Amino acid sequence: MAVPKKRTSKSKKKSRRSHWINKAKTRIRNFLNLAKSISNKKATSFAYSTIKN
Protein backbone atom coordinates (compact mmCIF):
# COMPACT_ATOMS: atom_id res chain seq x y z
CA MET A 1 0.00 0.00 0.00
CA ALA A 2 1.39 3.40 -0.98
CA VAL A 3 2.13 5.80 1.84
CA PRO A 4 2.78 9.51 1.25
CA LYS A 5 6.25 10.70 2.15
CA LYS A 6 6.85 13.22 4.89
CA ARG A 7 7.42 16.77 3.81
CA THR A 8 10.94 18.21 4.07
CA SER A 9 11.12 21.00 6.63
CA LYS A 10 12.07 24.55 5.64
CA SER A 11 15.19 24.50 7.80
CA LYS A 12 16.48 21.30 6.19
CA LYS A 13 15.71 22.69 2.74
CA LYS A 14 17.55 25.94 3.54
CA SER A 15 20.49 24.04 5.00
CA ARG A 16 20.88 21.88 1.89
CA ARG A 17 20.54 24.89 -0.40
CA SER A 18 23.12 26.95 1.51
CA HIS A 19 25.54 24.01 1.45
CA TRP A 20 25.12 23.72 -2.32
CA ILE A 21 25.55 27.49 -2.77
CA ASN A 22 28.70 27.55 -0.60
CA LYS A 23 30.21 24.72 -2.64
CA ALA A 24 29.45 26.65 -5.83
CA LYS A 25 30.99 29.83 -4.39
CA THR A 26 34.24 28.08 -3.49
CA ARG A 27 34.48 26.52 -6.96
CA ILE A 28 33.87 29.93 -8.58
CA ARG A 29 36.51 31.54 -6.34
CA ASN A 30 39.05 28.85 -7.24
CA PHE A 31 38.27 29.22 -10.94
CA LEU A 32 38.67 33.00 -10.82
CA ASN A 33 41.99 32.72 -8.97
CA LEU A 34 43.25 30.26 -11.57
CA ALA A 35 42.06 32.51 -14.40
CA LYS A 36 43.86 35.49 -12.83
CA SER A 37 47.11 33.56 -12.47
CA ILE A 38 46.86 32.34 -16.07
CA SER A 39 46.23 35.85 -17.38
CA ASN A 40 49.24 37.14 -15.42
CA LYS A 41 51.30 34.11 -16.58
CA LYS A 42 52.11 33.21 -12.98
CA ALA A 43 50.51 29.76 -13.04
CA THR A 44 53.08 26.99 -12.58
CA SER A 45 50.92 24.11 -13.83
CA PHE A 46 50.50 25.42 -17.38
CA ALA A 47 52.87 25.54 -20.35
CA TYR A 48 52.80 28.73 -22.39
CA SER A 49 53.79 29.09 -26.01
CA THR A 50 55.90 32.19 -26.54
CA ILE A 51 55.90 31.97 -30.36
CA LYS A 52 53.51 34.44 -31.98
CA ASN A 53 52.33 33.90 -35.55
Curated annotation (Swiss-Prot):
Chain positions covered by the region annotation Disordered: 1-21
InterPro entries linked: Ribosomal_bL32, Ribosomal_zn-bd
Gene Ontology terms, MF aspect: structural constituent of ribosome
UniProt keyword Cytoplasm, yes or no: no
Cellular component aspect of the GO annotation: chloroplast; large ribosomal subunit
Cell location: Plastid, Chloroplast
Keywords for the protein's UniProt record, in alphabetical order: Chloroplast, Plastid, Ribonucleoprotein, Ribosomal protein
Presence of the UniProt keyword Cell membrane in the record: no
GO biological process assignments: translation
Main localization, broad class: plastid
Family: Belongs to the bacterial ribosomal protein bL32 family.
Protein name stated in the entry: Large ribosomal subunit protein bL32c
Source organism: Cyanidium caldarium (Red alga)
Lineage: Eukaryota, Rhodophyta, Bangiophyceae, Cyanidiales, Cyanidiaceae
